[in-house]
């Protein structure tokens, strides 16, 4: 659960896929493809998911993902494997190269997400390449 104005992300995984669904509230989703050499490398997509449109979002490995709570939000998410803290990676939510449209003004951002590096500064061993090997 997140209160209106909260911003989570951008996170990404080299091995894990996520699936998000919002039964209550409105979340503004921002996805950015970090997979170097892939057909959609560098593309950013922004859209809302909510209890009204009933959209679910599949997020493959190598795609940075985050959301802002447009309203108070309840989000359910599934992952395709066991939790691995070494696969919890991040990139700056406000990176101008990514250019996400977060909708909220004056977002509430966790300390962890405030310190994520810019895309250009991602360490070599933490950069996803196409094709992904899980």
Task: Give names to the regions the model predicted.
Residues 1-55, 72, 77, 81-134:
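Non-catalytic, conserved peripheral segments adjacent to functional cores
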Residues 57, 65-70:
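Short beta-strand His + acidic residue motifs that chelate non-heme Fe in jelly-roll/DSBH
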């Amino acid at each position: 659960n997140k209160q209106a104005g909260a911003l989570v992300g951008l996170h990404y995984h080299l091995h894990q896929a996520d699936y998000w669904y919002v039964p209550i509230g409105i979340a503004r989703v921002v996805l950015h493809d970090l997979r170097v050499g892939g057909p959609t490398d560098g593309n950013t997509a922004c859209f809302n998911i909510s209890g009204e449109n009933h959209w679910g979002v599949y997020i493959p490995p190598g795609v940075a993902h985050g959301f802002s709570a447009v309203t108070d939000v309840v989000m359910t998410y599934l992952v395709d494997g066991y939790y691995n803290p070494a696969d919890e990676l991040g990139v700056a939510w406000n990176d101008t190269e990514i250019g996400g449209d977060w909708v909220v003004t004056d977002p509430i951002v966790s300390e962890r997400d405030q310190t994520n590096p810019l895309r250009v500064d991602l360490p070599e061993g933490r950069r996803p390449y196409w094709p992904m090997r899980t």
